[in-house]
Amino acid sequence: LTENTQLFCVGDDWQSIYGFRGSNVSYIIDFEKHFEHASVVKLNLNYRSTQHIVEASNKVISYNKYKVEKEIHASKKSEHKIVVFSGNDSNDNLLFCVDRVRELLKEGIQNDEILFLYRRSKMYTPYFNRFRKENLHIQSKTIHAAKGLEAKVVFIIGLTEGYGGFPDIWLEDRIFQIIKQANHDLLLEEERRLFYVAITRAKDKLFLITEKGNESSFLKEIPETFTVKTSVALQPVVEKVITCKKCFSRLEKLWVICPYCKEEITS
């Protein structure tokens, strides 16, 4: 580059999910090493997702060591927690999701405001068939295809360990390692970034679907303060958390005054 060259780059290393296609997250992370006098502006306000979703996703991505440090804040407040459902099997998960979709539609949510995400298309086949049978046109995408998209309500299915889950078994794929030299830790971090991308597609409500006894290890990285867990498919899910109406801080049920802003708590 010459002295008069002007270079402008935009990117988010936290959403780098195409390493299997040859992309390299180091282009963003090490940008300042290659261009020492670069001026870096970090966009740290999330206008899409609620506070609980943003804080949960921040915690998940914090487990990655190789990243640009950022502190992302949410512009939206909400009482709704992230729902984690652990079914006994895939049929349990299907029943739970169908039941929740019916409830959401009754609440006034539109079909195109609900998005189902998954790693591989075949995971969604039973859901597609069920929704088609009930004449429900619900949006669905693979997580990679959903990058850049958003929806009021997001369901992420297939959050289990092993093949096709999170993290996926392809991390140990010998053919992949022949094509491209693979570092296990860095590939694991890309898997976590994929999970981060999935979580942050949700604007208002997020449902994480797993199987009892085979939960994705990434689910354990979300603090329980942001989630409500259930394993009964047709049981109403209490997914709200008490917050101060003035400062939006999380509160305990028995508090009568917000300890942060001294606002009186009313039911």
Question: Where on the chain are the PLM-derived regions?
Answer:
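Conserved nucleotide-binding/hydrolysis micro-motifs of P-loop NTPases
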Residues: 13-17, 22-26, 46-51, 90-91, ...
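Conserved RecA-like ASCE P-loop NTPase motor core of nucleic-acid helicases/translocases
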Residues: 10, 43-45, 53, 81-92, ...
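Conserved helicase C-terminal RecA-like lobe
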Residues: 110, 125, 135-137, 145-212, ...
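Short conserved AdoMet
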Residues: 2, 36, 109, 203, ...
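Helicase C-terminal subdomain and adjacent C-terminal extension
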Residues: 176-186, 197, 204, 210-267
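Short, solvent-exposed loop/turn elements at beta->coil junctions and helix N-caps
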Residues: 71-73, 142-145
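Conserved RecA-like helicase ATPase core segment
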Residues: 1-83, 168-169
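Helical mechanochemical/support elements of P-loop NTPase systems and associated helical scaffolds
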Residues: 24-27, 49-52, 56-61, 90-93, ...
